[in-house]
Amino acid sequence: MTMGFVGLCRARSKLKRKPKGFMKNEIGIHEGIKTVGVDNYCDFSSSSDLCICVVTWNMNGQVSYEDIEELVGRDRKFHLLVVGLQEAPRNNISRLLQAALVESHILLGKAIMQSVQLYVFGLKNSELFIKELKMDKYAAGGCGGLIRRKKGAVAIRINYNGTLMVFISCHLSAHTRNVEERNSQFRNISDSLFSKIWNPFSRPAQITIWLGDLNYRLQGINAFPARSLIQENLHKLLTGKDQLLQEAERGQIFSGYCEGTLAFKPTYKYDIGSNSYDTSNKVRVPSWTDRILFKIEDGDKINATLHSYESIDTIRNSDHKPVKAHLCLQVNK
C-alpha cells in the first residue's frame, strides 16, 4: 500500500529514537501527545528563522469582515499565517482574508473542499522562498444543509526556504459516542494525504501541523459539573476527561505530536452571539473540539518554541471559538 507523507511521519514515530531538546518548555508526556508550555515573549528577531501563526475556526456558516480581521489579528510580523476553516460559508473567504492582510501578507496557497478550507499566507515577497507547493484533500462524508458540514481534511505541503512543512485543516465526525470513527478518520487522513505523489526518495515533512475541529469531547462528566468548574476557572481539571488526550494516551492517534497546555476554556458549544455555553434543550457538555497540534520530525535540525496557544473569545458569531497558536522555529541547516 502506498503511504502518504503524513502517514510516513506517523510510521516513523514508532521508532525508539527520540530527539532531545527539540521542543522547549516540555511539561508532560502522554503516549501520543507531548504537552508543552508557552514562552510568552517573542521579538521576531533573527534568533527565529521562521515564525508561524496558526488559526483554526469552525465558522458555523457565518462570516463578517470584522470577524476575519479579528481572526488574523493585528500583529503582522509572522513569516507565515496559516488559517484553517470548517463549516465555512459560500462567501469568498479567500478575498476577505486577502483584504484583511493586504498591507503585510500575500496568499501563497489554498486548499478547499467545500466547507473545509486552508489558506497559507506569507510576508510580501515570500513567494521567492517557495521551493515546493502541493495541495491534497481527503473526504470523509457529510456536506448537507445550508452550512455544508463537510467532513474530512485539506492539506498543503510547502517547502519554505528549505524547511519542508505539511499543514492539515480537518473536520472530523461529531458527537461524543463517535470516538472510534474519529480515530479511524485521523488514520485514513494520515495515510492518504499526498500518497499519490509519494516515492521512496522524497523527504518526509520536517514539521506537520494539524488544525481544525477534531470534535473530540469531554467524556465521563455531565454538562453542569463541567460548567461549574469552568465558571470557577478550574477548567484545567477537565483535561483528564478529554477524549483526544485519552485516545492519544492509548496510542490510537497523534503519536509523537505536541500540543500547548489547554489553559483556555473549552471552545464548544456556545450560544451564538455570546460567551455563554449552550442553553438549548440539548445542554451539551463544553469541550475542546478545536485544536492545533504539531510534530517535529527532524529534531536534530529544528528547535521549536510555542509562544501562545489560546482561544479568541471576542469572536461570537459561531457556536465555536477560534483557536490560535504562535510557533517559532530555529533551523540548523
Kindly give the residue locations of the regions a language model identified:
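Amphipathic alpha-helical protein-protein interaction segments
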Residues: 45-47, 57-61, 76, 85-90, ...
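Core residues of folded domains in eukaryotic genome-function proteins
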Residues: 48-55, 77-81, 103, 115-117, ...
